[in-house]
Amino acid sequence: MQGQIIKALAGFYYVESDGQVYQTRARGNFRKKGHTPYVGDWVDFSAEENSEGYILKIHERKNSLVRPPIVNIDQAVVIMSVKEPDFNSNLLDRFLVLLEHKGIHPIVYISKMDLLEDRGELDFYQQTYGDIGYDFVTSKEELLSLLTGKVTVFMGQTGVGKSTLLNKIAPDLNLETGEISDSLGRGRHTTRAVSFYNLNGGKIADTPGFSSLDYEVSRAEDLNQAFPEIATVSRDCKFRTCTHTHEPSCAVKPAVEEGVIATFRFDNYLQFLSEIENRRETYKKVSKKIPK
């Protein structure tokens, strides 16, 4: 039989096939080969009625996330709150860089709109990200329309209201929610395991919350491509490997000055580039200490 893993918990993999869910385990040869099944995997499996089954084969994945461990994703809703925690374009761009690098379509959703005081600032970000080509939504109804028939991951900083939002769009989930800690300004981790839920002919997944994101981009070229508006303009740079920092005849820096590329987006790009270069330098220093 063939099906999709919709939940992984305590060594068991729950596989959905033809409307039924089967409890399975992975064969020992998966561990020997270093292969781990993840939520979202399409698998071949065997299972007798009312008995535990076994995963026999994992099909090729189109994409994957490490944290949370989930695969074969169509799109990801990045939830950013107006307040508690405050909207942070740097953190949002870290999520977007990760998703662009993984080939996952991003949707930006703004939560806690009732706490909004300055609509002008939100309009600025909505216009900027919209011009780049991102869906930037503020209403539950608009978000629901984008979920039909898709496998969607929900992600965001701890405390932005992922579980609260999912409870609103799919009340049957009844997910646990947490409040913001006054001392830290962070929410309690309320999501315990990654699971798929059926909604609007597609599947949605709530994912464990976290307050920081280490994107998996290690090359300047990949970072360039993860900023779509920079990637487009950089085609006119003199050098194909232009990092838009010191090279002559760079097309990106004038585009920033002219407002074609938002200054805050370019600043975030430069910060991420510096972090990549610093990681490389640290790796070189550590490597030198390894004895021959």
Curated annotation (Swiss-Prot):
Cofactor details (free text): Binds 1 zinc ion per subunit.
Entry GO MF terms: GTP binding; GTPase activity; metal ion binding; rRNA binding
Keywords in alphabetical order: Cytoplasm, GTP-binding, Hydrolase, Metal-binding, Nucleotide-binding, Ribosome biogenesis, RNA-binding, rRNA-binding, Zinc
Protein name as catalogued: Small ribosomal subunit biogenesis GTPase RsgA
Record text on subunit structure and interactions: Monomer. Associates with 30S ribosomal subunit, binds 16S rRNA.
Cofactor: Zn(2+)
Main location: cytoplasm
UniProt keyword Metal-binding, yes or no: yes
InterPro entries: G_CP_dom, NA-bd_OB-fold, P-loop_NTPase, Ribosome_biogen_GTPase_RsgA, RsgA_GTPase_dom, RsgA_N
Lineage: Bacteria, Bacillati, Bacillota, Bacilli, Lactobacillales
Gene (UniProt): rsgA
Subcellular location: Cytoplasm
